[in-house]
Amino acid sequence: MDLKLYDTLTKDKRAFVPLDPRNVRMYVCGPTVYDFAHIGNARPVIVFDVLFRLLRHIYGDSHVTYVRNITDVDDKINDRALRDYPGLPLNEAIRKVTEKTATQFRADVDALGCLQPTVEPRATDFVLPRPDGKTDMVSLIKTLIDRGHAYEANGEVLFDTASMPDYGQLSGRKLEEQQAGARIAVDAHKKHAADFVLWKQSSADEPGWDSPWGRGRPGWHIECSAMSAAYLGETFDIHGGGLDLIFPHHENEIAQSRCAHGTHAMANYWLHNGFLQVEGEKMSKSLGNFVTINELLQDWPGEVVRLNMLKTHYRSPIDWTLKGLEESAKALDDWYATAGDAAGSAPADTVMETLCDDLNTAQTVAALHGLRHQAEKGDAAQRDQLAASLRFLGFFSETKDAWDARKREASGVDAAQVTALIADRTAARARKDWKESDRIRDELAAMGVAIKDSKEGTTWEIAR
């Protein structure tokens, strides 16, 4: 089956044809580690993990390179370092901030069932020319100046957007129509309002590197142009990120990379996931609905969070609700109950078909429910396919018994008490005391325990 992906640049869904099937290359913008990642940050992590898994399935594990960067130089990081570690030298304070948040981010990603990317470069390692000759930011800026695409002004180096005739293709913003806005800083020394910073001066209390333009630090956009080229080359297959990055970040990445390398494209496919809101409102600290991934994982297993993300197509907006989490938890309970201890074979064709249709995970989840219904009727093959499909998607990371034990522990239900009540109920049923049997059943239900009678005896689980 052919993989089709929606390309933001061309505005259509088309067949994915890699530049080299033996070396499929994908870059996704990672976190800026000034604070712990929030649930909105989890969406691209999960979405592009599924794509990474799918590409590996199609082309082979060793033939796919996935780069997701860590931005560890940023004005917000600088502010956080000065606030949290006022007594330390700035560079040491910055490292403390970024190490703590980057370590937590990796732990969050693991808990969400995501594979680690092939490479996870840090921006600070690519500012200056490197011993290994990989692309760096200073050299890239020099090239842009030499080719007439950048200029020095007021101690900064800026990209000359007018030097690129088709600037604005990704976002659909024509250069002449662009006005100063919230994300475009307008200064008198700019040739055009849309010109953006490649290199800026650093004061004594800001991080900086010595460069041909004085001590300073890179602009946001040049970082990803350098790191992607360093590992994936001048043109690669897929570039991903959130919708909020289309402009200005990805637009400016394209401008820098194409103009520096003289290429027709930076990436051949541009994928963007939709926005996330919480209970119908924009997530923000001021509304009190700002939740970090780590905070969410204190209350919900990573697999529940993962499924809740994947129930919605990645390009659609998602409303993050408690009801949705509860429904996702119930679905996983059902899947574990049906196939949690199945050996598994290969993912079902219906699952792979939905994924190959622009990562239509909403339909994938529907296909998983269909497999479960067939498995519940005694279809062993469907049961194995359900288990294999879920493992392929990053679920079933633990045994059925471990999943059930986790659920019981989280519920606070006393397992010994439940076992004793079930024994009392079994005895009541044996003497045909149906009133007592029903009373015990109701008592268990009030505790949040659901029971199931079969020829083998009575089993129980925590009711969601």
From Swiss-Prot:
Q: Cellular location of this protein?
A: Cytoplasm
Magnesium as UniProt keyword: no
Question: Catalytic activity annotated for this protein?
Answer: tRNA(Cys) + L-cysteine + ATP = L-cysteinyl-tRNA(Cys) + AMP + diphosphate
Q: Please give the GO cellular component terms listed in this UniProt entry.
A: cytosol
Q: Which InterPro entries match?
A: Cys-tRNA-ligase (IPR015803), Cys-tRNA-synt_Ia_DALR (IPR015273), Cys-tRNA/MSH_ligase (IPR024909), CysS_C (IPR056411), Rossmann-like_a/b/a_fold (IPR014729), tRNA-synt_1_cat_dom (IPR032678), tRNAsynth_Ia_anticodon-bd (IPR009080)
Q: Which GO terms describe its molecular function?
A: ATP binding; cysteine-tRNA ligase activity; zinc ion binding
Key word Nucleus present: no
Q: Which Pfam families match?
A: CysS_C, DALR_2, tRNA-synt_1e
Segments carrying motif 'HIGH' region: 31-41
Residues forming the motif 'KMSKS' region are 282-286
> Source organism's superkingdom?
Bacteria
Give the UniProt family note: Belongs to the class-I aminoacyl-tRNA synthetase family.
Q: How is this protein named in the record?
A: Cysteine--tRNA ligase
In which organism is this protein found?
A: Afipia carboxidovorans (strain ATCC 49405 / DSM 1227 / KCTC 32145 / OM5) (Oligotropha carboxidovorans)
Classification lineage: Bacteria, Pseudomonadati, Pseudomonadota, Alphaproteobacteria, Hyphomicrobiales
Q: Which gene encodes it?
A: cysS
